[in-house]
């Protein structure tokens, strides 16, 4: 069953519907994060979904939250269906609701969000490569000359962006601009934690034959104003993963993500257009990439 939108008939209030997640309020302190099978490209959500995508994103996030818990606390309250349904209204255990929620939901603690996308880059690619070719900078930061496409930076760099409303574009900003936005002390802590998280994840991924080129973290503040890791973590939606065996300096790399979909949209001049449905072949190839990423990173077979 592919779930592109949840409908809980008002049993829990819907707080937000993002590009992928439907978020419900459980009580004053808790939210239910439901990762649907929606997929977007070029800031447009496709009409049809990718089978099991939401489940893979959810299980991969749980895997990383556990692996990285010694670096920073996270917002997880419950991640197993048994524990989640025990804390939800009984009605939601009925088959029509359970089918929408099982395997793709997380019960999380509510936090005050830090209004930054904490992007960490270990390799020069994508928009960073485009900027570097023009100005030898990345997010306005001077970077050493002579780098080739997909080359590793000497050290991972923190390149934040603003958190845009849905339908708007996140805007790349310099660390100095980020400090003006959230305060110097908080910005420095976000940068330090984001780089520590990236570094641990990069080393683990490399041990599994995967290069973590870059990723995006989001943070919140708890009641004691301490930093907490929130949202999703190190999924193909928030990260660029490359196969280490196929890595080749001086060119763009194939990612474990929705590149098939982007390429198909571009070749048919559909990028940025609303109301587009993927072909079965493109949906299946994209689903296979998400599954491949899960299996490569966790060492588990996706059932």
Swiss-Prot record:
Q: Which reaction does it catalyse?
A: 5-amino-1-(5-phospho-D-ribosyl)imidazole-4-carboxylate + L-aspartate + ATP = (2S)-2-[5-amino-1-(5-phospho-beta-D-ribosyl)imidazole-4-carboxamido]succinate + ADP + phosphate + 2 H(+)
**Which Gene3D superfamilies does the record associate with it?**
ATP-grasp fold, B domain, Phosphorylase Kinase, domain 1
Kindly indicate whether the keyword ATP-binding belongs to this entry.
yes
Its Enzyme Commission number(s) read: 6.3.2.6
Which InterPro entries would you find in this protein's record? SAICAR_synt/ADE2_N, SAICAR_synth, SAICAR_synthetase_CS
- Which keywords fit this entry according to its UniProt record? ATP-binding, Ligase, Nucleotide-binding, Purine biosynthesis
Coiled coil, from the record: none
Enzyme class at the top of the EC tree: ligase
An example GO CC term for this entry is:
cytoplasm
PROSITE patterns assigned to the protein according to its UniProt record, in alphabetical order: SAICAR_SYNTHETASE_1 (PS01057), SAICAR_SYNTHETASE_2 (PS01058)
Q: Which GO terms describe its molecular function?
A: ATP binding; phosphoribosylaminoimidazolesuccinocarboxamide synthase activity
User: SUPFAM superfamilies, from UniProt?
Assistant: SAICAR synthase-like
| UniProt pathway annotation | Purine metabolism; IMP biosynthesis via de novo pathway; 5-amino-1-(5-phospho-D-ribosyl)imidazole-4-carboxamide from 5-amino-1-(5-phospho-D-ribosyl)imidazole-4-carboxylate: step 1/2
Q: Which GO terms describe its biological process?
A: 'de novo' IMP biosynthetic process
Any Pfam family the entry gives = SAICAR_synt
Q: Which family does it belong to?
A: Belongs to the SAICAR synthetase family.
Q: Which PANTHER family match?
A: PHOSPHORIBOSYLAMINOIMIDAZOLE-SUCCINOCARBOXAMIDE SYNTHASE (PTHR43700:SF1)
HAMAP family found in the cross-reference section: SAICAR_synth
What is the name of this protein? Answer: Phosphoribosylaminoimidazole-succinocarboxamide synthase
- Which species is the source of this protein? Pichia angusta (Yeast)
């Amino acid at each position: 069953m592919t779930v592109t939108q949840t409908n809980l008939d008002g049993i829990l209030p819907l707080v937000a519907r993002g590009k992928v997640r439907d978020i419900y309020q459980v009580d004053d302190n808790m939210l239910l994060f439901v990762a649907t099978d929606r997929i977007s490209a070029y800031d447009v959500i496709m009409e049809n979904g990718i089978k099991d995508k939401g489940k893979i994103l959810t299980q991969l996030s749980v895997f990383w939250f556990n692996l990285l818990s010694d670096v920073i606390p996270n917002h997880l309250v419950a991640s197993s269906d048994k524990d989640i349904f025990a804390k939800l209204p009984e009605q939601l255990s009925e088959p029509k609701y359970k089918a929408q929620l099982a395997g793709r939901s997380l019960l999380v603690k509510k936090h005050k969000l830090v209004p930054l996308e904490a992007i960490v880059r270990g390799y020069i690619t994508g928009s960073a490569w485009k900027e570097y070719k023009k100005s030898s900078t990345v997010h306005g930061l001077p970077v050493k000359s002579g780098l080739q496409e997909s080359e590793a930076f000497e050290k991972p760099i923190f390149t934040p962006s603003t958190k845009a409303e849905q339908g708007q574009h996140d805007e790349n900003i310099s660390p100095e601009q980020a400090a003006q936005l959230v305060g110097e002390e908080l910005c420095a802590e976000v940068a330090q934690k984001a780089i520590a998280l990236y570094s641990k994840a990069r080393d683990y991924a490399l041990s599994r034959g995967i290069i973590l080129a870059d990723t995006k973290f989001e943070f919140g503040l708890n009641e004691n104003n301490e930093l907490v890791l929130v949202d999703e973590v190190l999924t193909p939606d928030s990260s660029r993963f490359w196969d280490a065996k196929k890595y080749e300096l001086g060119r763009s790399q194939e990612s474990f993500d929705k590149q098939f979909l982007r390429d198909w949209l571009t070749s048919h001049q559909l990028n940025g257009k609303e109301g587009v449905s993927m072909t079965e072949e493109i949906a299946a190839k994209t689903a296979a990439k998400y599954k491949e990423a899960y299996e490569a990173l966790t060492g588990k077979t996706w059932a």
